[in-house]
């Protein structure tokens, strides 16, 4: 039981106990809504940033001992690819262009997706095992050159709004794709003949989603994949 593991750890590391958002427990973190996880994340970050480097390392190590992602990563992935658990995984949630759906192998289902942590588990180990902190993504979007350990927004509210695991997330209805001529002399009816004369751009009903487009280089990716 994760709560017992937590209690045992804070007995030997009192500093860790103060790192948890009041009212939250280790077990509740596993299924907490994403908006709650963001509050936990920022509470933890603010707390450890106020500690000395030595005490910060102690808290980080203690938190990692409780929320051991490496020990549970396979179990988490197996849970996500099991259709009976209600998850339907097809394309990368971030770019929607790379097929990451699992497929049947000889003995078990094979996964193609990576379980991206929306909130960086390295900065806050408390959210390392939280179900709503996982986004099935492709290795490109989850790679160090794009998402990596970056945050998806600059403020608490932006991060809550931009996570695909938050019920308020509505990228595909708030962002419209348009194909525009690159040059004024280009005729608008010859896209199929000269796709290199056009570019994909975005119209935002909610401009906060421009941060996702920039973070995942979606304009560059879509233009490279579909118009070049």
Show which residues each predicted segment covers.
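Short cysteine-rich loop/turn motifs with clustered Cys
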Residues: 80-112, 138
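Histidine-centered nuclease catalytic patch
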Residues: 99-133, 147-160, 167
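Short, flexible, mixed-charge glycine/proline-rich loop motifs
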Residues: 76-88, 126-131
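Domain-exit/linker segments immediately C-terminal to small folded modules
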Residues: 132-228
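Short Cys/His-rich Zn2+-coordinating modules
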Residues: 65-80, 116-123
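N-terminal accessory alpha/beta regions
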Residues: 1-75
């Amino acid at each position: 039981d994760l709560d017992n593991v937590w209690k045992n750890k804070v007995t030997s590391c009192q500093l860790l106990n103060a790192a948890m958002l009041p009212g939250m427990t280790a077990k509740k973190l596993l299924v907490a809504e994403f908006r709650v996880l963001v509050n936990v994340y920022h509470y933890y970050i603010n707390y450890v940033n106020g500690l000395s480097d030595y005490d910060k390392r102690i808290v980080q190590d203690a938190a990692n001992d409780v929320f051991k992602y490496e020990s549970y990563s396979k179990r988490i992935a197996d849970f996500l690819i099991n259709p009976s658990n209600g998850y339907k995984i097809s394309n990368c949630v971030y770019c929607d262009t790379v097929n990451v759906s699992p497929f049947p192998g000889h003995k078990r289902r094979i996964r193609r997706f990576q379980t991206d942590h929306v909130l960086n588990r390295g900065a806050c180990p408390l959210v390392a095992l939280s179900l709503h902190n996982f986004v099935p993504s492709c290795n490109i979007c989850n790679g160090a050159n794009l998402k990596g350990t970056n945050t998806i927004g600059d403020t608490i509210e932006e991060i809550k709004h931009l996570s695909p695991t938050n019920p308020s997330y509505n990228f595909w209805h708030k962002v419209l794709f348009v194909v525009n001529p690159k040059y004024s002399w280009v005729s608008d009816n010859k896209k199929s003949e000269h796709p290199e004369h056009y570019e994909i751009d975005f119209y935002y009903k909610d401009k906060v989603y421009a941060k996702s487009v920039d973070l995942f280089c979606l304009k560059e990716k879509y233009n490279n994949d579909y118009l070049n």
